[in-house]
Design a protein with these regions (language model features):
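Small-residue hinge/turn detector
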Residues: 508-509
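Alpha-helical interaction/regulatory segments in DNA maintenance proteins
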Residues: 528-547
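Radical SAM enzyme [4Fe-4S]-AdoMet core and its adjacent flexible, acidic
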Residues: 232-244, 311, 354, 359, ...
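Terminal RNA-binding accessory module
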Residues: 403-491
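Glycine-rich beta-alpha loop elements in corrinoid/cobalamin-binding modules
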Residues: 20-144, 437
Length: 547
């Protein structure tokens, strides 16, 4: 759950402590528009949060689209209506390789379109009786201004359909980018916030304590370009990490939410590690000591083509990126209690930037092949064509290069998935690795898709129809380029269907049919005899249940 609905709820409750708030996801509204209409009809105010600043693919939910924003107003019967979120400021994109825009008719469909900070503007609207002269571009002056709204809005999490086990709460640590001093990356919106403005540790802990008191158990420190520089005293383009501040942040989080199950991070700037290796290593060690395993440090490498790096003022050249990947591996590759390595890098590549040629795709591919050949691990490789935003330095360049290179991008993506992603997943979660706390999310025929809760969790396909929303321990049995296959443990051989048995390494259709015909088995020896190859049984011996 992002900060928007929680901040907005906190602003409303701060202005009117007796307000009765209802929160529904966009997917709930799509599935049951009549209920949403009846809730709106009984309300004074309806707020739609819409849009994203980074395009992506989603498993069991998706953000509000331009089509949603254009059609939903017909169902909003409240006296006042508000549109806010990234779409209200930057518009809607049609995915990667496009330019965002606000549909011409959209502003006329809502009473207020908030391009500033929603919680600040909505608080002012309520206290001023929805004055039409309210400045909808208003932004908070300091990051700490949000602390009271963040804490007061925490109880709204109870209304999320995935609460509590399947819900992870995004927690903002700061906004702004030190690289804004030199313009920042050409495509990024973060420099628009100026230099970093850190929230206080006390303010963040207060929010997390309120969330924990409301029942939240999963958290992610997100919404910042580089967590390593949290609390840094430097005021330059590449500030040195403050390991003590990072430790205080995570220690305070643990104290505020002592029963938390997940504490993960998001973005880290690879150039920080390259230029400040000692301080970065110390800060990373504090993170690994105090977070929960299965964590991912998303590195904005963006391109391994040095010409693209130079033309777009990107963060790091390939040498520095490779160094950062190596450092994170050295500290975070130990496997944790949930079966995943503690902390691995995730690599982000952006395509369609000025300076991109056919050689760019080759440079990115061979960069990742080198990572693989060095024996290093990355959790994910995120390849996306840029989404051009207004007010960024790339706005005047547009999306023409992304459209021109679309066919190159698709071919390159397929090559990266086959030649890098698949062998990398085999390294990150070898066959027979047991992942703990895998939650079922989506059923497609006789396949159930599931994931652990966390930052960029690994997608696990289970070849059986299972109830959704349950937590399982799963043994990994096969690897694809973007997901893995597995079975719940213990392996109940006497109860499994044909497809489940066939998914076990070494058991094909003939052996699976034999097992079904000759079961139930009362001992491992009986099972071993039926398999006619003892080596098949050896890796799963401790995982079998013959009841």
């Amino acid at each position: 759950m992002d900060v928007y609905p929680r901040y907005i709820a906190g602003a409303i409750w701060d202005a009117d402590p007796t307000a009765d708030l209802r929160y529904i996801t966009i997917d709930q509204l799509r599935n049951d528009p009549k209920t949403a209409e009846s809730i709106s009809a009984a309300s004074e105010l309806s707020v739609l949060v819409a849009g994203v600043t980074v395009p992506g693919k989603y498993l069991s939910g998706s953000p509000a689209t331009a089509r949603d924003a254009l059609t939903i107003p017909r169902s909003l019967k409240s006296r006042h209506t508000v549109l806010c979120g990234p779409a209200a400021r930057f518009g809607f994109g049609r995915g990667g390789g496009t330019t965002t825009e606000i549909p011409r008719s959209l502003p006329s469909l809502y009473e207020f379109v908030i391009s500033g900070d929603p919680e600040t503007v909505i608080h002012e609207l309520i206290t001023n009786g929805f004055n039409q002269r309210t400045d909808t571009d208003t932004v908070r002056q300091r990051s700490n201004d949000v602390n009271r709204y963040a804490a007061k809005g925490a109880p709204i999490v109870r209304q999320h359909p995935c609460f509590p086990d399947g819900l992870i709460c995004e927690v903002e640590t700061f906004r702004g980018c030190p690289r804004s001093l030199r313009g920042g990356c050409s495509f990024c919106t973060e420099p628009l916030h100026g230099t970093p403005d850190f929230r206080s540790v006390a303010g963040i802990a207060g929010e997390m304590g309120a969330l924990a008191s409301s029942g939240a158990v999963n958290f992610r420190f997100g919404r910042q370009p580089d967590l390593l520089i949290f609390g840094s005293k430097d005021e330059n383009e590449c500030p040195e990490p403050n390991p003590g501040a990072v430790k205080r942040l995570f220690t305070a989080a643990r104290r505020a939410a002592p029963s938390l199950r997940v504490l993960h991070i998001d973005n880290i700037n690879p150039t920080t590690i390259f230029h400040h290796p000692d301080a970065s290593e110390e800060a990373l060690k504090h993170i690994v000591e105090l977070h929960t395993p299965g964590d991912v440090a998303a590195l904005g490498v963006e391109s391994a083509d040095e010409e693209v790096v130079r033309k777009n003022n990107l963060k790091v050249y390939p040498e520095g990126a490779l160094f950062a990947i190596s450092v994170i591996n050295g500290i975070g590759n130990r496997r944790g209690e949930n079966g995943m390595p503690h902390l691995l890098p995730g690599i982000n590549f952006v395509y369609g930037l000025p300076g991109e040629t056919k050689n760019t795709f080759s440079a990115n591919f061979w960069f990742m092949k080198k990572v693989l050949e060095m024996g290093l691990m990355v959790r994910r490789i995120n390849m996306r064509q840029l989404m051009v935003m207004p007010s960024t330095r790339l706005a005047s360049f547009g999306d023409h290069l992304a459209r021109k290179h679309r066919h190159l991008f698709i071919r390159h993506k397929m090559q990266m998935r086959a030649d890098v992603d698949k062998p990398m997943l085999e390294r990150v979660v070898p066959t027979w690795t047991v992942l703990r706390g895998v939650r079922t999310e989506l059923a497609e025929g006789r396949m159930t898709w599931s994931r652990q809760i966390g930052s960029y969790p690994l997608l696990v396909g289970i070849p059986a129809a299972l109830p959704l929303g349950i937590s399982l321990d799963v043994a990994i049995l096969s690897h694809g380029p973007r997901s893995v296959g597995g079975l719940p443990v213990p392996l109940r051989i006497n109860r499994m269907g044909l497809r489940e048995l066939q998914s076990i390494p070494g058991i094909g259709s003939k052996r699976a049919a034999t097992l079904i015909r000759r079961r139930p088995f009362k001992s491992g020896n009986e099972l071993s005899t039926a398999l006619d190859d003892r080596s098949i049984l050896e890796p799963m011996a401790g995982l079998i249940d013959l009841t």
